[in-house]
From Swiss-Prot:
It is found in: Cytoplasm. The gene is glmU. This is Bifunctional protein GlmU. It comes from the Bacteria. Pathway: Nucleotide-sugar biosynthesis; UDP-N-acetyl-alpha-D-glucosamine biosynthesis; N-acetyl-alpha-D-glucosamine 1-phosphate from alpha-D-glucosamine 6-phosphate (route II): step 2/2; Nucleotide-sugar biosynthesis; UDP-N-acetyl-alpha-D-glucosamine biosynthesis; UDP-N-acetyl-alpha-D-glucosamine from N-acetyl-alpha-D-glucosamine 1-phosphate: step 1/1; Bacterial outer membrane biogenesis; LPS lipid A biosynthesis. GO terms for biological process: cell morphogenesis; cell wall organization; lipid A biosynthetic process; peptidoglycan biosynthetic process; regulation of cell shape; UDP-N-acetylglucosamine biosynthetic process.
């Protein structure tokens, strides 16, 4: 969309959140509220995005990418004042769309409709509105018939005006040239002593300019988030949207009430999500995989046909047709090739496990390279840390480690080798070798343990 720009209001302090974090940085479905709005703008191909910052500027600015321009509002003197700071940056821009950084539930299709109406009617301004049964605290849209008159804020409205149910969402399209002139005519003469952006509509009306409205059917898009309770309510709406989307895309979700999927997750058709599954970050799950129950995956990749149950995974890669869990813990740097089995009470960290290898139960594998078709017996651990440095363990293809083997890194187990149960291996084992390390078993006859009387 040439000659368009978006201006996102994000300068407010968010006092009711009672947080050191700026309001628009609180997350919804795994992303900051502000990022939801930015992503929505970019999905409708608006080429420029400007964010007006004030409180918490440094924290917010540090999270923005190079595509986002920052406009600073040093003093928060109202929405009109915020736009006054942005207008000088609108070089070669014919129209702007103004949004609020604390309204993360706005949808791309709504913005497209708003922009379409604005262009079709060659309007000076087009407002996004919504109808609430209880619009308490929200600015009202005043009309004469279908003709827009003005917006009145709750604190400045008469008792009769407060009965109006159509409200101002705070999202607008403006003709930049006309907005620039109208801003010269607004003053802070209101109950708050601020420059209201909404006062430009009265200026437009007096000048006979075209003002249009578009009423969204989804009132959730108008929800501004000012408290933790409102954030929780918005989280529920976002979660239901995400769940509905993936079910429409061919994903089976056994119990939507107990399933949580963040916005950055990608799922393929015929994935099955069991109850109490939580998928976070950039997690990707391929077709026919079954996740859960009671599984949390963050920034993980799961291959086709794998089964992952009662597992916590973070920044792990799981190949195709693997079996993981129950009660496995996959830490960052874990890479499992196809057909790997990781069983109960197994922890893996920063390790590569080759195709067809098995770690069935009660093991810790850290900083290791494990080959193909390896069997790691119950209770086997890699001793990879000396209190200062981490060391690597290498286990070659087809090795068989007996139960309760301790591998003192750095150490290498050769291809096809076997370790005896209970061995502590601290030296490299050649290929096709049996390695046993045990102290001599002693029997003390006629020994009876002293008992306290």
């Amino acid at each position: 969309m040439p000659h368009w720009a978006a201006v996102i209001m994000a300068a407010g302090k968010g006092t009711r959140m009672k947080s050191k974090l700026p309001k628009v940085m609180h997350t919804l479905a795994g992303k900051p509220m502000l990022q939801h709005v930015l992503d929505c703008v970019r999905s409708v191909e608006i080429p420029r995005s400007m964010v007006v910052l004030g409180h918490g500027r440094e924290q917010i600015e540090a999270t923005l990418d190079d595509r986002t321009e920052v406009v600073v509002q040093e003093e928060q003197c109202g929405t009109g004042h915020a736009i006054m700071q942005a207008i000088p940056h609108c070089h070669e821009v014919d129209h702007i769309i103004v949004l609020s950084g604390d309204q993360p539930l706005i949808r791309p299709e709504t913005l497209r409709n708003l922009i379409r109406i604005h262009i079709e009617h060659n309007a000076a301004a087009t407002l996004l509105t919504a109808c609430f049964e209880n619009p308490h605290g929200l600015g009202r849209i005043l009309k004469e018939g279908d003709q827009f008159l003005r917006v009145v804020e709750e604190k400045d409205a008469t008792p009769e005006e407060r009965l109006v149910q159509e409200i101002n969402t705070g999202t607008y399209c403006f003709n930049v040239a006309k907005l620039r002139e109208a801003l010269k005519n607004i003053t802070p003469k209101n109950a708050q002593g601020e420059y209201y952006l909404t006062d430009v509509f009265a200026v437009f009306h007096a000048q006979g300019e075209v003002i249009r409205t578009y009423c969204t059917e989804d009132v959730h898009e108008a929800l501004g988030i000012n408290s933790r309770a409102q954030l929780a309510a918005a989280e529920d709406v976002a979660r239901q949207r995400i769940l509905s989307y993936w079910m429409e895309e061919g994903v089976t979700i056994i119990d939507p009430r107990s399933t949580f999927i963040e916005a950055g997750v990608v799922l393929q058709p015929d994935v099955v999500l069991q109850p109490f599954t939580i998928l976070k970050g950039r997690t990707q799950v391929a077709e026919d995989a079954v996740i859960g129950p009671h599984t949390t995956l963050t920034d993980c990749t799961v291959g086709a046909g794998s089964e992952v149950s009662h597992t916590v995974g973070n920044q792990a890669v799981i190949g195709g047709h693997c079996t993981i869990g129950p009660y496995a813990y996959l830490r960052p740097g874990t890479v499992l090739q196809d057909k790997v089995k990781v069983g109960d009470f197994v922890e893996i960290k920063n390790s590569q496990i080759g195709e067809g290898s098995k770690i069935p139960h009660l093991s810790y594998v850290g900083d290791s390279q494990v080959g193909k078709s390896v069997n790691i017996g119950a209770g086997t651990i890699t001793c990879n840390y000396d209190g200062v440095n981490k060391y690597k363990t290498i286990i070659r293809d087809k090795a068989f480690l007996g139960s309760n083997t301790n591998l003192v890194a750095p150490v290498e187990i050769g291809e096809g080798s076997v370790t005896g149960a209970g061995s502590t291996i601290s030296k490299n084992v050649p290929a096709n070798t049996l390695a046993i390390e045990r102290s001599t078993q002693k029997h003390i006859e006629n020994w009876v343990r002293n008992k306290k009387k």
